[in-house]
Amino acid sequence: MATLIQQVESLPAAYPTAPVGLSSAVAALVKVSWQRIEPYIAWRFTPRAVTWTVEGPGEWHPPLQPATISAVEIWSGADEWEAVTVAASPLGGYCLPATGPYRFTAEVGGGVAPDIVQEAVKRLAEYLAAEPDMPGATSERTEIPGVMTSEVSRIASWRARAMQNSGAADLLRPYRRA
């Protein structure tokens, strides 16, 4: 099995459009939501350039989808990249016959984001837009003696765990692998 050494992915010119029916506060966080979701999944829905450096030998598959490979090069004994043709593998990747390293240049992304991915973007944006009940605090207790007691707590890392806590991660599970 070939080993991915490096992945250099450029930023897209734009992210997919925001789902309809969002408040202005939530819509303002759609780009941020896409920026958090894309590293979490192996699929891209807007085109951008990517370069992979791979060490062989063995079979290798692009880790991002959809991918259109435009060039494959190998590092030569002359200390420069030279164009090379590699055979297709039986499982849809590439067979790298030598150690290399190889450089794959591609464009990834395209198509329309499925409804479930758009829902994940919406859930994450809504979660991030929610105002914390207790700014700077991890717990708050309100008590009216003899009438009521209310205690609310929130872990300090609630924003860091937004992907999981919002439910977006569960929706994105099928898109984690290429």
Protein language model regions, located:
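Surface-exposed interaction regions enriched in Ser/Thr/Asp/Glu
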Residues: 90-118
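Extracellular/luminal ectodomains and secreted, surface-exposed scaffolds of diverse proteins
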Residues: 74-99
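Glycine-enriched, solvent-exposed interface loops adjoining structured elements
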Residues: 1-76
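Residue-level marker of positions within ordered structural domains that often coincide
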Residues: 38, 77, 109, 130
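Generic low-complexity segments that are intrinsically disordered, proline-rich and/or Lys/Arg-biased
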Residues: 13, 17-20, 58, 63-67, ...
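Short loop/turn elements at secondary-structure junctions
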Residues: 2-6, 112-178
